[in-house]
A protein has these predicted regions:
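A short, Lys/Arg-rich alpha-helix, primarily the initiator
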Residues: 1-18, 26
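Helix-turn-helix DNA-binding elements, focusing on the entry/boundary residues of the two helices
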Residues: 9, 20, 36, 51-54
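Low-complexity, intrinsically disordered/propeptide-like segments
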Residues: 12, 29-30, 57-60
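Short alpha-helical DNA-recognition segment
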Residues: 16-41
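Short, conserved catalytic or interaction motifs in soluble domains
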Residues: 44
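DNA major-groove recognition helix of helix-turn-helix/homeodomain DNA-binding modules
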Residues: 50-65
Length: 65
């Protein structure tokens, strides 16, 4: 069974010990409009983050390219 981008984002966030609120604050401080609702929407597969926002999240989660 394939994981969706959203499922993978949620798994990485939890594995990194980050809350949705922490990620919202981090993204907002980096110039992105990312409310907690927005992050839940990404994780539920209802929308997708921009590539730049995804890069910030990957760095916060310790995911390397």
């Amino acid at each position: 069974m394939k994981s969706t981008v959203g499922e993978t984002l949620r798994k990485c966030r939890i594995a990194a010990g980050k809350s949705v609120r922490e990620m919202s604050e981090l993204l907002t401080s980096n110039g992105f409009k990312a409310s907690e609702k927005t992050i839940y929407s990404w994780e539920n597969g209802n929308s997708q983050p921009t590539p730049d926002a995804l890069l910030v999240m990957c760095r916060a989660y310790g995911v390397e390219d």
